[in-house]
Swiss-Prot record:
Protein name (database record): E3 ubiquitin-protein ligase RNF8
Domain notes: The FHA domain specifically recognizes and binds ATM-phosphorylated MDC1 and phosphorylated HERC2. This domain is also required for proper recruitment to DNA damage sites after UV irradiation, ionizing radiation, or treatment with an alkylating agent.
PROSITE patterns for this protein: FHA_DOMAIN, ZF_RING_1, ZF_RING_2
Main location: nucleus
InterPro entries assigned to the protein according to its UniProt record, in alphabetical order: FHA_dom, RNF8, SMAD_FHA_dom_sf, Znf_C3HC4_RING-type, Znf_RING, Znf_RING/FYVE/PHD, Znf_RING_CS
Domain of life: Eukaryota
Gene that specifies this protein: Rnf8
Catalytic activity: S-ubiquitinyl-[E2 ubiquitin-conjugating enzyme]-L-cysteine + [acceptor protein]-L-lysine = [E2 ubiquitin-conjugating enzyme]-L-cysteine + N(6)-ubiquitinyl-[acceptor protein]-L-lysine
Length: 487
């Protein structure tokens, strides 16, 4: 068979296009045009704008970017989104490009609590342009004019909001997602700022959902939310933006974090009491464990302080933005209730700072108590070690004074006891009796001699714990005396 015509092959390739097919739907597919950069998110400056009907904050403003590398292969990059980008069920590291191939599975965001799959799931395909046309989602060019008037009325510029530091990879999700007990981060504040640009009539359902989620936010958040609801203006006017929801959400999450911090403090206090009861035994294992607990407690304290300080700084920035927004509203609409709400939020902020200071002092007290307990345990260990050394020293004195032969001044070797109850080395007393048949100590006549196995065994056991020089010297003496005895 002949080779295919290059011109025909090029025409076939030109009629085909890469696309992200949305799973479970025959529409809202995202076309990847060759030579272009495709951006996806909920903002206005992206190629494809995704607005979630269930959880508006699931998709970040500029969630991800798809473009071709120098080899012409398509890549996807997570643009530091809050809920992440998943390629074949694995979360991508932010700001790193990953190559995609035909058949790959792409997921934007995370599944909601009541569902198994995420709202936006796609499959990478390559099809004819004509067959793709009915299924493609419209590009953001069609929605630019629609939201143009709305963007001009916003008091917070999108550039200023986008400059807030975005979080890296995290398991944090929106209030309806699984594992939503973690505190909200700056990305959630962006979403609240967008929601604030809508009329108050549209904000009422959101406030109702916040009331429903009060139960899991802790007692501090439950007491804060009704106060904020009372401060909302009774008269609803079109296009009255407010960032109070973002402040409320940040307060709730910060208070929840403070409750966890207090619980951990109570647990550490109980642990200190238990250690005090058991520290009298003074084992080295306890010393090591207490040192490790102390280091863990210090690192936890520093981490909690850093997180709380970051949230306080973000809260102060939000308050500054709300104050600027409030000034604009007073000039246009004259609503003084928002100013009262800001003052109340500042009072809550001061209370939060006081609570943080109290928590810090409590942690410092716990650390000081652990330091004192550790010092006492070390002192007890030193005392036990000193007692052991004293016993060993006393044992050496006994060996030197009571278990030495008076003739050779060495520890008994094959000890024998005479009829006068004095003990000597068997070799030494035999040599002595060649000159005199009387005890070298009491001068009584030697009538009998008895081997003392008890003394031999006792001396052998004690010599095993002495230095190697002493053991070597004793072995040499035993060999020499046995050799002389054979002669």
């Amino acid at each position: 068979m002949g080779e295919p015509d290059p011109l025909v092959s090029g025409q076939l390739a030109a009629r085909r296009s890469w696309c992200l097919r949305r799973l479970g739907m025959d529409r809202e597919w995202l076309q990847l045009e060759a030579g272009s950069e495709v951006t996806i998110g909920r903002g206005f400056s992206v190629t494809y704008q995704l607005i979630s009907k269930v959880c508006p904050l699931m998709i970040s403003r500029n969630h991800c970017v798809l473009k071709q590398n120098p080899e012409g292969q398509w890549t996807i990059m997570d643009n530091k989104s809050l809920n992440g980008v998943w390629l074949n069920r694995e979360r991508l590291a932010p700001l790193q490009g990953y190559c995609i191939r035909k058949g790959d599975h792409i997921q934007l965001g995370v599944p909601l609590e009541s569902k198994e799959h995420a709202e936006y799931e796609y499959e990478v395909i390559e099809e004819d342009r004509e067959s793709l046309a009915p299924c493609l989602a419209p590009k953001n060019d069609h929605t630019t004019e629609k939201h143009k008037g709305l963007r001009t009325k916003r008091k917070f510029s999108s550039d200023g909001v986008e400059s807030l530091p975005a979080e890296g990879p995290s398991d944090l999700r929106c209030p309806l997602a699984k594992g939503s007990s973690k505190p909200a981060e700056p990305e959630k504040l962006h979403g609240k700022g967008e929601a604030a640009s809508q009329p108050l009539g549209c904000l009422c359902p959101t406030l109702a959902s916040l009331e429903a989620s009060e139960r899991t936010a802790g007692p501090h958040a439950c007491s804060t939310l009704p106060k904020v609801l009372e401060l909302y203006p009774k008269k609803q006017k079109a296009c009255s933006p407010s960032a109070s929801q973002s402040s409320l959400e940040l307060f709730k999450m910060t208070m929840s974090r403070m409750l966890k911090l207090k619980t951990q403090m109570q647990e550490k206090q109980i642990a200190v009491l238990n250690v005090k009861r058991q520290a009298r035994k003074g084992s080295s294992k306890k010393v090591v464990r207490m040192e490790k607990e102390l280091r863990d407690l210090q690192s936890q304290l520093y981490a909690e302080q850093a997180q709380q300080q970051a949230r306080v700084e973000q809260l102060e920035k939000t308050f500054q933005e709300e104050e600027q927004h409030l000034q604009g509203l007073e000039k246009e609409q004259g609503e003084c209730d928002l100013k009262q709400q800001l003052l109340q939020a500042l009072q809550e902020h001061r209370a939060l700072m006081e609570e943080l200071d109290r928590s810090k002092k409590d942690f410092e007290k716990i650390i000081q108590a652990k330091n004192k307990e550790l010092e006492r345990t070390k002192e007890e260990k030193d005392k036990v070690q000193a007692q052991k050394e004293e016993v060993l020293s006393h044992m050496n004195d006994v060996l030197e004074n009571e278990l030495q032969c008076i003739i050779c001044s060495e520890y008994f070797i094959e000890a024998v006891t005479l009829n006068c109850a004095h003990s000597f080395c068997s070799f030494c007393i035999s040599e002595w009796m060649k000159r005199k048949v009387e005890c070298p100590i009491c001068r009584k006549d030697i009538e009998s001699r008895t081997n003392s196995l008890v003394l031999d065994n006792c001396i052998s056991k004690m010599v095993e714990r002495l230095s190697s020089d002493v053991k070597e010297r004793r072995s040499v003496l035993i060999r020499e005396r046995r050799a002389k005895r054979l002669l």
